[in-house]
């Protein structure tokens, strides 16, 4: 064999006379990944990285989704399937993505192109998923910002029924004259036909989704009739993007400092709100309801599905964020400890936030005389209706309201930073011209978000948001992460991946991690994908049913990100060098790595069998 140049300067490698690569490296052979990359910026400190990852993973879902899922799925017993899913899928995939980003030191697109060119489409899929999430996530932050600056008032607008949009069905919760709160008995409960001032403010006064002055909660908008733009929401969204831009335009050196506040401040507020919550009447009932175990619920597949879904959306594999953040680490950073630490913080925050939420729900049940299941809500209804209503009944209500919505803003901002950084890093590494003009690129990205976001600033904007939440994330995310696990286990090879980890940190992951990466995670992910397809239902929101066309377009939209995986794979295969299918397959399934004293990434096969798992 002799070394001959190829037409592609990035593919200089030994070849036989038929043009096929004939060089192989033993698994512990001299592959140099050039850990010192002077052109790659790095975190200015280890804590910048840890706080950025914690800030991304701990988001609004920890506050408004996990506690509700515990309540819905058997109370404390939900922690059993949740913990199992964390141990078998969440943490292993979290760890895997951090390792891949740190080893290849690039964003998702370039990293997957180097791991396995045939599956470079995984990188495009995860970037597109992060793109879809950013469309609606920052609108929720705009809502929080509106509530935050509106809270700087002696009279909170969601505490009163004296507004122009209020209906005769509106009621105001009150404290007693001596400053204490008395619990209502069942026969004193608020009528189910009544609508709280907080609910009317959110849906009628703020969003305009429900008809003003009407004594009901019927949706009056549709996806074909979104109504007028709510310019106060649009202005808030513009301010959110200004905050994001000036936090991210210079890269991780600016965002890495901002997260010192946005990642740590929520824990201060959660502690304060917990102390306040356990001083309210009825708090014990709320906590008991949150933790009361119902072991019969473990027999329901939906409980396990909810646990797995929460793990993936909470820890965040498949969004490209973990790869992007870890790509700025020192090559020999102990990402194993980082993965365990940040995963634990995330899961503990989810669990502890339940005490903050349900102590207040117990209080609301006490105040209204309604059972807790009639008070509890999931998603925006919890943080923009139920919790603000509870805070409005307390002495010094504006103070508590400012504190709560400032916490929501900080929780959401660093998660927004993560999603945007995944896109910026992924595209900048793949298209270097964007990296050279980062400030302009980031500005154009957020300007595009702002234009798209206007549709969700209309009176029916929440209908578009719900459509994006359902169709823009779940299927593409699950398919991408499933492909990630399968490629690492069965094409790239676990033995090679384990060697890469050893090269970085000096030790090999044990059999537990190999089992999770090769068996447990792919099986659970495939089960989730199958379940999502089998149990698919046409989308509804409150009493509004989405038209058939919206659901059909939604399904196409849901699969748009995942479609990049086969499309890019076909393109790579068709254009691969080689005279036979076997030669082309070898070309597109070999990882691109570096030899000693070379700067180019070249395709280098290994001698290890791809199916060799437990080694």
From Swiss-Prot:
Side Extracellular, residues: 73-76, 152-229, 279-302, 359-398, 461, 542-544
Record: residues binding Na(+) 2: 57, 62, 314, 346
Consequence of gene loss (knockout): Significantly reduces the learned avoidance of bacteria that induce mitochondrial stress.
Compositionally biased spans, kind Polar residues: 15-24
Alphabetical GO biological process terms: amine transport; amino acid transport; cellular response to amphetamine; chloride transport; dopamine uptake; dopamine uptake involved in synaptic transmission; negative regulation of cellular response to manganese ion; negative regulation of cellular response to oxidopamine
Amino acids binding Na(+) 1: 55, 58, 411, 414-415
Transmembrane domains' residue ranges: 47-72, 77-100, 121-151, 230-250, 254-278, 303-328, 335-358, 399-424, 440-460, 462-488, 519-541, 545-565
Main subcellular localisation: membrane
Sequence ranges on the Cytoplasmic membrane side: 1-46, 101-120, 251-253, 329-334, 425-439, 489-518, 566-615
Subcellular location: Cell membrane
Record GO terms (molecular function): amine transmembrane transporter activity; chloride channel activity; dopamine:sodium symporter activity; metal ion binding
A Gene Ontology term for the protein's cellular component: axolemma
Stretches the record annotates as Disordered: 1-39
UniProt topology in membrane: Multi-pass membrane protein
Disulfide-bonded cysteines: 161-170
Residues of this chain annotated as glycosylated in UniProt: 162, 187
Keywords: Cell membrane, Disulfide bond, Glycoprotein, Membrane, Metal-binding, Neurotransmitter transport, Sodium, Symport, Transmembrane, Transmembrane helix, Transport
Top-rank lineage group of the source organism: Eukaryota
Note: This protein is the target of psychomotor stimulants such as amphetamines or cocaine. Plays a role in promoting amphetamine-induced loss of motility in water, termed swimming-induced paralysis.
Family of this protein: Belongs to the sodium:neurotransmitter symporter (SNF) (TC 2.A.22) family.
Role, per record: Dopamine transporter. Terminates the action of dopamine by its high affinity sodium-dependent reuptake into presynaptic terminals. Plays a role in the learned avoidance behavior of animals exposed to food that induces mitochondrial stress.
Protein known as: Sodium-dependent dopamine transporter
Gene: dat-1
